[in-house]
């Protein structure tokens, strides 16, 4: 079998309905669009218009705002850190921080810092220097004999 032998299953692809091709076709002249009016013309879709009814975006109240000072963190689980150590991508003896995790390929695009979560197990004794960590993650790191350095404000 070759690529040029491949065919669609019969009946799986319907032929396009060609409209406006003469009155004998059944869909000639107005092409199933009715007579005159906005919807019979081209480029009709009026986004958000609900036929005169008060549209949903005006029925619902405006809410909230976007905090321009909000910080976005890269979330990394302890299991992923351990997997990177096992694969030889991360050095357990060196300090684990944003740069080392990025170099190891654990995170792709660096944001405002790294936040460590407790998913998975940590066997290695590792020193972390990160922007944040969950309480459970801190407990697991200390239980494994490691240490964690957090900014004072981020300590939870």
Swiss-Prot record:
Instruction: Using the UniProt annotation, give all residue ranges assigned to the region (Disordered).
Output: 1-40
Query: Which segments cross the bilayer?
Result: none
Which Gene Ontology CC terms are recorded? cytosolic large ribosomal subunit
Q: Which GO terms describe its molecular function?
A: rRNA binding; structural constituent of ribosome
The identity of this protein, by name, is Large ribosomal subunit protein uL15
Q: How does it assemble?
A: Part of the 50S ribosomal subunit.
Q: What does this protein do?
A: Binds to the 23S rRNA.
Keyword Ribonucleoprotein among UniProt keywords:
yes
Residue ranges annotated as compositionally biased, kind Basic and acidic residues, are 1-11
Q: Which domain of life is it from?
A: Bacteria
One GO biological-process annotation of the entry reads: translation
- Which family is it part of? Belongs to the universal ribosomal protein uL15 family.
> Which Pfam family, just one, is annotated for this protein?
Ribosomal_L27A
Give start-end positions of Gly residues composition bias.
Answer: 21-35
